[in-house]
């Protein structure tokens, strides 16, 4: 469980306190029985209620022998409007799992310690989140840490004599403290940028603390970033994967962007630092000791400044997620070459700790590295990457010889290498099934795939999923574009079905074989819609030229790609071309707002979730300013900056409102600081002022996503009521 998941879990727990449910007497939220599943499935089809009833598998860790695992699953109660994370053990020999959690308090982050005789985990059973231990059968639970504040995550050293605890510390770099004699004042005085991030006002940031562990208790905690105003792990999504112990336990490698305020807001330049436990000295592994930060123009895109290019061994983009080789000779991490560009190709960098030489071992791979882990012999890696709408597992050695390990219409994510060089532990999902845990074991030229968990079997046994097909579409400029088409269950080609164009967000996130608990294609298909999901310009997995063509051209070829996709689908006799809808979130919401004024009457309904309506407004409202700086070309007041900037703001969706002629539903979370909810309010107001049928759905307590069960159900019901009203009449 990473920091993001822990924060979400804490938020859900806090939200529960406001509910009229006695936490002490609340029912245990866990895996649903087959009869409970039957109450949420409708005519053998997936429903929003069934979707929220499914278990969501988190981390899975093996013991050193590889014969026992521990993993977490999060369940949701619509009635109680909260989640509950529980731990399971898994016997690799008998293939049996056992629930270890007996409390209504959430537990997670399970790992084996003491040679596999104990499981360490996080629990809030004592009133705050602390590190506990228990036997592999769940007995003899005992609290190990007694910190005065919450432990968000932990990481034991290889010899287990020390442990890293992730805890929050006060931050006053952007928000100053209010006067002490005004304890009930709610005003927020901000002195610099990054006063808000994702969905929080930044009054606290995570820091890594190192503590001693004598086998009985965790004590002697000290902050390795003491008096430094920087976050580690990096907000908003970084977790303990951004830190690593050296095999001898003498050093800690950590990820950090040592910037604050405006400097932080315009830069993606994070580095890998090596902290020596004994001396307390820190060394930057990404830059030379005499490196001086170049001066940057904050209102001009870094793409136009010399600071954004890697020079020699000095890296200036995202460097994160360090891992030492098992033999201690190397350290590896993921690295981007350009500052201010969060979608640059992620390469796997390997540093020889003795010679200081760096090697990029995935240069021959045409896409970016998502996750990686060392092989036990320290001679290579497993890693995942997106290619042609699928996320697969690959291998590479230290020479950079890359080979694809997995095939099929799936998305994989790595968990850990199996001990003794036997393969790798992964999670796998598709557009038709949620995450389950598998082992991959190479055998000669083949691969043995073994499924370990069947968390949601009771659902799949009662649900018929729609067929998912790959479809290649010719774009308006003559390129070939991969689209996924999802058909309703029991599809009949002799009938006509309304169709939806799905507009992906990001704007550089892949339309791979993803499974979503909100934007779920199978729920849409279960409502008798055909969905086409294009891998339009700007998405990874089709080479860097395809990926980067969207930067500075939001309203250009990528929009034509959308229209090419829906026009191609409409050639099929079973598609009702008079009843088409376009839906999307984030950049997908931008796409919907833009298409609303440029669709030539193709669509009969639009839905935009957390979308950008006004690009000029977005530039000064969002918090991570490197993003609009790069993609829009510069600040809107830099009149003569460049053609890219002028086009980005001159083609903003709000400038086409005079052409809007179609009903539109605008959805937004009011805790969304990435794209402010005022964008949806503005779009809704414009639509109603023009006399269009429109609806506005606001969530005062949600961010860029919808995380609470009852809000999620309301989202789905509103979504389909709107589509059905306009596309099924």
Located regions from the model:
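Predominantly five- to eight-bladed beta-propeller fold
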Residues: 26-35, 84-85, 168-227, 255-273, ...
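A short helix->beta-strand "capping" segment at the edge of beta-propeller domains
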Residues: 34-55, 219-229
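Beta-strand-rich domains and repeat architectures in extracellular enzymes and scaffolds
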Residues: 49-85
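Conserved beta-propeller blade repeats
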Residues: 55-69, 104-122, 141, 148-163, ...
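Short glycine/acidic-enriched loop and turn motifs that connect beta-strands
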Residues: 75-79, 125-128, 170-173, 259-262, ...
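Cap/lid segment of the alpha/beta-hydrolase catalytic domain
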Residues: 260, 446, 455-578, 585-586, ...
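Active-site-proximal cap/loop segments of hydrolase catalytic domains
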Residues: 520, 525, 533-729
């Amino acid at each position: 469980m990473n920091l993001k998941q822990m924060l979400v879990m804490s938020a859900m727990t806090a939200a529960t306190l406001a509910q009229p449910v006695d936490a002490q007497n609340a029912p245990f939220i866990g895996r649903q029985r087959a009869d409970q599943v039957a109450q949420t499935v409708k005519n053998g089809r997936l429903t929003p209620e069934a979707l929220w009833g499914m278990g969501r598998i988190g981390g899975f860790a093996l013991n050193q022998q590889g014969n026992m695992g521990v993993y977490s699953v999060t369940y949701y109660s619509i009635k109680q409007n909260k989640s509950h994370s529980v731990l399971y053990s898994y016997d690799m020999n008998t293939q049996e799992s056992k629930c270890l959690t007996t409390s209504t308090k959430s537990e997670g982050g399970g790992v084996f310690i003491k040679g596999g005789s104990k499981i360490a985990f996080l629990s809030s059973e004592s009133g705050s989140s602390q590190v506990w231990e228990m036997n592999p059968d769940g007995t003899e639970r005992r609290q190990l840490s007694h910190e005065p504040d919450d432990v968000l995550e932990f990481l034991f050293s290889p010899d287990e004599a020390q442990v890293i605890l992730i805890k929050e510390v006060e931050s006053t770099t952007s928000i100053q403290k209010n006067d002490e004699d005004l304890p009930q004042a709610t005003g927020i005085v901000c002195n610099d940028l990054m006063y808000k991030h994702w969905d929080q006002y930044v009054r606290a940031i995570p820091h890594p603390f190192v503590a001693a562990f004598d086998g009985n208790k965790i004590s002697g905690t000290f902050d390795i970033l003491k008096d430094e105003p920087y976050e580690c792990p990096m907000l908003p999504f970084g977790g303990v994967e951004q830190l690593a112990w050296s095999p001898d336990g003498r050093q800690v490698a950590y990820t950090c962007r040592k910037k604050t305020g405006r400097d932080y807001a315009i830069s993606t330049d994070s580095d890998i630092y090596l902290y020596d436990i004994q001396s307390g000295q820190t060394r930057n592994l990404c830059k030379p000791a005499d490196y001086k930060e170049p001066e940057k123009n904050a209102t001009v895109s870094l793409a136009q400044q010399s600071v954004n290019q890697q020079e020699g061994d000095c890296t200036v983009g995202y460097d994160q997620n360090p891992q030492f080789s098992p033999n201690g000779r190397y350290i590896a991490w993921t690295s981007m070459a350009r500052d201010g560009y969060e979608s640059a190709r992620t390469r796997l960098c390997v540093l020889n700790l003795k010679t200081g030489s760096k090697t990029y071992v995935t240069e021959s791979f045409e896409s970016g590295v998502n996750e990686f882990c060392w092989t036990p012999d320290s001679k290579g890696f497993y890693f995942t990457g997106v290619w042609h709408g699928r996320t697969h597992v690959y291998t590479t050695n230290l020479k950079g010889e890359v080979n694809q390990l997995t095939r099929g219409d799936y998305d994989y994510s790595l968990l850990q290498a199996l001990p003794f060089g036997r393969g790798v532990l992964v999670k796998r999902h598709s557009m038709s099934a949620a995450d389950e845990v598998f082992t991959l074991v190479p055998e000669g030229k083949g691969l043995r795939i073994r499924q370990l968990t069947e968390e949601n079997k009771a659902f799949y046994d009662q649900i018929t999923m729609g067929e998912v097909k790959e479809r290649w579409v010719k774009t308006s400029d003559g390129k070939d574009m991969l689209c996924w088409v999802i058909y309703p269950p029991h599809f009949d080609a002799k009938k006509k079905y309304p169709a939806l164009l799905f507009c992906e967000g990001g704007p550089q996130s892949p339309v791979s074989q993803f499974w979503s608990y909100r934007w779920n294609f199978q729920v849409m298909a279960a409502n008798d819609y055909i969905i086409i999901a294009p891998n339009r310009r700007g998405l990874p997995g089709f080479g860097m030229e395809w990926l980067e063509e969207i930067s500075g051209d939001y309203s250009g070829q990528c929009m034509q790609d959308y229209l090419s996709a829906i026009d191609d689908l409409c050639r099929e006799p079973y598609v009702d071309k008079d009843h088409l809808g376009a839906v999307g979130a984030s950049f997908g919401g931008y796409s919907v707002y833009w298409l609303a004024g440029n669709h030539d009457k193709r669509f009969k309904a639009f839905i935009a979730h957390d979308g950008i309506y006004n690009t000029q407004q977005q530039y000064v409202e969002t918090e991570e300013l490197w993003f609009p700086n790069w993609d829009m070309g510069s600040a809107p007041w830099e009149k003569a900056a460049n053609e890219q900037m002028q086009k980005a703001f001159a083609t903003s969706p709000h400038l086409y409102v005079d052409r809007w002629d179609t009903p539109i539903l605008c959805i937004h979370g009011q805790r969304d600081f990435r794209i402010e909810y005022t964008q949806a309010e503005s779009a809704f107001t414009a639509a109603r002022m023009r006399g269009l049928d429109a609806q506005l759905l606001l969530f005062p307590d949600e961010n860029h996503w919808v995380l609470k069960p009852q809000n999620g159900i309301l989202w789905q019901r509103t979504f389909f009521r709107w589509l059905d009203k306009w596309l099924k009449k």
